[in-house]
Amino acid sequence: MIIEINETNIGDAAKVYMESWKDSHQDICSAEFIEKHDFDYMLNFLNEKIKQKYDIFIDFYNEIPVGIVGINPEDEEICLLYISPKEQGKGFGNELLEFALSKCKNPYITVLDTNKKAIDFYLKRGFVPAGNQPEPNKEKCIFERKYVYQNKNM
């Protein structure tokens, strides 16, 4: 069941976000940088996105939080698609992506160039590269690439 995050489930969303973010970034970021992204950091980050009017959703399966996704309604960027590491490969990523796509006319995403797993996921679902932007993380020279959605038939 996908619902908008609120005061009662934002802690669940922050936990999923923290676990998945750390798992997906462990090979590309320093241990110090990863350590900074604890529960409180992720909770504050989600609260900040909500203040910025992002629409953020959480997916529950059998009352267990399994993933999150966000949409910036200003430019239709689909962001914050994170699935709990122990729940990956079970279709929850597809479910959340399809949900987000249904709310956008011209969606796009940005992905770290080093996140091959995410890139493969998006390429298989109709996204194509659209350019590079510098990653704001100054600890490493990491780049994000913008991908636009072209395939309306997932």
Language-model segments: what does each one mean?
Residues 4-10, 15-86, 97-99, 135, ...:
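Acetyl-CoA-dependent GNAT
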Residues 5, 108, 112-119, 124-125, ...:
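C-terminal "cap" of GNAT-fold acetyltransferases
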Residues 11, 90, 116:
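Loop/helix-junction capping segments adjacent to catalytic residues or to phosphate/diphosphate-binding pockets
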Residues 55, 105-107:
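Short active-site oxyanion
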Residues 67-70, 89-93, 126, 131:
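Glycine-centered flexibility sites
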Residues 83, 89-102, 120-124:
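Conserved acetyl-CoA-binding loop-helix of GNAT-fold acetyltransferases
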